[in-house]
Amino acid sequence: MKKKQKITLYRIIITAVMLVVLQFLPITGIPRLIAYLAAYLVIGYDILRKAGKGILNGRAFDENFLMALATLGAFFLAIWTKSGDYLEGIAVMLFYQIGELFQSYAVGKSRKNISALMDIRPDYANIEKDGKLEQVDPDEVAVGSIIVVQPGEKVPLDGVVESGNASLNTSALTGESLPRDVKEGDEIISGCINLNGVLKIRTTKEFGESTVSKILDLVENASSRKSRSEAFISRFAKIYTPAVCISAVLLGIAVPLLRMAFGMDVAWVDWIYRALTFLVVSCPCALVISIPLSFFAGIGGASHEGVLIKGSNYLEALSDAKIVVFDKTGTLTQGVFEVTAVHHNTMDEAKLLEYAALAECASSHPISKSLQKAYGKEIDRSRVTDIEEVSGKGITAKVDGHEVLAGNAKLMALHNISYNDCHSVGTIIHMSIDGEYAGHIVISDVIKPHSKEAIQKLKHAGVEKTVMLTGDAKRVADQVAKELGIDEVRSELLPGDKVNEVEKLIQNKPKKANLAFVGDGINDAPVLTRADIGIAMGAMGSDAAIEAADVVLMDDDPMQIAKAIKISRKCIGIVKQNIVFSLIIKFGCLALTAFGLANMWAAIFADVGVMIIAVLNAIRALKYKE
């Protein structure tokens, strides 16, 4: 509890004790008024001061003004009627302050939780000087410097591991509890915690450009981007508060005057009491406080799961996502070619793979790398001679004196070698040894383990259509889409075509449905920007993703997409619950008050009670459960 909150708590306790004591003190008249006025000032002086400042600054119609007017009015009413019943006015202020303290504590707890979840800001960096480690501010470390990260310390800057190996806790960035292992030569990003081992890292970015700085900046600025709901509440409060003040004046003055004109009993005290109660009931605290808090908690809860949402406007838009468009490579697939099948004739499978890897050893093409990876042994280049690349067809070479052809069907046709057709999805490498067809190897982009389940979860979450965009051939794209259960495919696209396809989908979508585009953030910036919601996946270390997207998924697991949508819908559900609940209770109590069926105590519940319930509901957005 902060110092300001402690002072408020002490004031509440002192006032409560004073009220209990005053109930048993046999004092009347002026001494009684002074004693109760002292209790009132102890609990309400700050509200009176804020109300006064608001009037002087031209912002009279706020909750402080309503509370000050209602409670002072109750005091003057007790003085006027000489009843000596000052308890209600003080009780209203006391319970209002209890509600404010609770709200302040809840907001503070939410902020603390979010700070803990995003506790990735490094305090220092270790630089080695004269054989000793010196702690310096991360801002002072230049690009290319060597920093040392010891067990238990945060990685302060992005870089490459020069020496050492360790396990890293990346949970604050990705929401993933399993440690990530790094070794010499691996890229490493700031914000991770070194669990074991000493790492020497060569920095590749300044602190201001590092991943941790960009993420912190994103989270800190999220509250500045207001949602439609928050904008509505702001507009509502500007109209609502003056309207209820005018209604209270009409209730307390106009109604008695009207009754007087018709010769009815005026009952000034009764109607003024109703007007003051009306003011207490009307305070819009529950809405003004709980709606922004709901979004704040929702964004914080999402960040704990490795989902960074740039503002409450994007969180609200994400909740209306009905169409999700995927870029295939790197999003639904690994984006890395692998040997997925070896179909051989008489030659042994391992031997066929060995010939292919050796023949392709001079190439830097991804296909060559995937063959060498599948072979898994060190390449002995002395075994290979006469390597020749046949443009658009493949490679010819001599391996251990044998003439080897490795390429597509065109290469086989060029050398008049009959080959077997392959219906597997992927790139087919046909192999010929000494003029005889030896078989073929299938290389393809591997689908991520959770992609199919991710599509199913999206449909369960209410997404009506899934679309895949890819530059792959139609046959390959259709096969992937069928395997994953994707509704529509756009294949054989050039990079610029993707924006046009998204434009068409946006033009044809239902009016209130939003389109979300999911990419890996590397070359998708134009499409991420054009979609209603741009979602970048696997953004650890990707500046482009963090800059271009509205929602950033720190992990490359497609399951995170459905999780992000569910979090947004839970948050918006809480916002709607609070709006409906608050307005029903408020207007119900206002009607009861106007007809004289609710007293000041009911007014306190309608204000403070509703605010506490709404705040409790709002902080539910911090937690996400499957």
Which role fits each region the language model picked out?
Residues 1, 116-209, 313-356, 398-399:
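Conserved cytosolic catalytic loops of P-type ATPases
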Residues 1-17, 34, 48-76, 216-250, ...:
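Soluble-to-membrane junctions at the N-terminal ends of transmembrane alpha-helices
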Residues 2-124, 226, 235, 242, ...:
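Transmembrane helix-loop-helix hairpins at the membrane interface
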Residues 57, 63-71, 173, 273, ...:
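Conserved catalytic phosphorylation-site environment of P-type ATPases
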Residues 339, 343-465, 474, 486-502:
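P-type ATPase nucleotide-binding
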Residues 399-401, 427, 433-577:
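Conserved ATP-binding TGD loop and adjacent catalytic N/P-domain core of P-type ATPases
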